[in-house]
């Protein structure tokens, strides 16, 4: 539920190559969640609407990441976390918190107290997190609150595409 393209500052992967790799690995949809940008996701969705969910991984004012899924307007980097969640919801999107307990980018879970009531799903497995306990903490936090748990590759290279996924009925 969380993948990047070359529109992210830390990824060089062509958007179409990312989708091709995902389809080759048996995934039928990808959530393109570039850092603070949505143009590549929108363009890919326009060409392959049945395979792409538009998202954005927003670096909030608190320096933690919040993902908006099913959005159509970019949310500026540096927007406060609570406002980011509200702006996602205003677009009819879902608030998804990636790697919530990973030090710098997740803030060690500290932002969850502030935005927990606005969270639609939390990333309980991130394939790029090497410390299992960080994923386990996310799952425990979500379960204690009855919040759905997602998973993702957080792919920044083509080789990482498909290392984490969510199985669900087609929609």
Positions of PLM-derived features:
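Divalent metal-dependent hydrolysis catalytic cores, especially in the metallo-beta-lactamase
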Residues: 18-36, 93-96
């Amino acid at each position: 539920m969380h993948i990047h393209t070359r529109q992210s500052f830390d990824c060089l992967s062509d958007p179409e190559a990312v989708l091709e790799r995902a389809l080759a690995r048996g995934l039928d949809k990808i959530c393109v969640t570039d850092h603070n940008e949505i143009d590549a996701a929108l363009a890919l969705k326009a060409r392959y609407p049945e395979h792409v969910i538009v998202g954005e991984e927003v670096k909030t004012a608190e320096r933690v990441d919040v993902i908006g899924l099913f959005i159509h307007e970019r949310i500026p980097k540096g927007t406060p976390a609570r406002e980011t969640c509200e702006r996602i919801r205003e677009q009819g999107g879902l608030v998804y918190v990636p790697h919530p307990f990973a030090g710098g980018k997740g803030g060690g879970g500290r932002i969850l107290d502030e935005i927990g009531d606005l969270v639609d799903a939390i990333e309980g497995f991130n394939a790029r997190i090497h410390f299992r306990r960080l994923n386990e903490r996310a799952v425990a936090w979500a379960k204690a609150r009855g919040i759905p748990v997602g998973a993702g590759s957080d792919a920044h290279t083509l080789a990482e595409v498909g290392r984490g996924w969510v199985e669900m009925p087609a929609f």
